[in-house]
Amino acid sequence: MSEVSIIGLDIAKNVFQAHGVDVGGRKLFSRRIARSKVLEFFVGVPRCLVALEACGGAYHWARELVRMGHEVRIMPPAYVKPFVKRQKNDAADAEAICEAVQRPNMRFVAIKSEEQQASALVFRTRDLLVKQRTQIINAIRGHMTEYGWVAPKGPSWV
């Protein structure tokens, strides 16, 4: 396995799929890895390019792999999809990720730090709460209208 140059990693809830190729693009391995064994697997792999599809957990795994010395690139799923050659499954997805990362015009997603992720989480959570509050106010206003009570717009009137 010393000649591996690129690994496409399809991450999932419990079992990940890794697809490794050499410099010439020849398949060296395709294996399933339990979530608990992923870091252990990459300790035994020489430093290489690891490609991930942007999804839940991708930033976490990217940061972990960068700490181990690997070069990591994250791609949007829409850019990976055209490279799936056969029926959609974890092995085909890992192979497609591995293929897509080699394209010269591929666009990548920047790896966010934990601080950047936490900041984005706060803003997304606030937006969600504001939307939910608006939905509740509108529902109450609608129910009130059914009984003949009409309230002006705005949260202070409901």
Model-identified regions with their sequence ranges:
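A detector of single, family-specific signature residues
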Residues: M1-V158
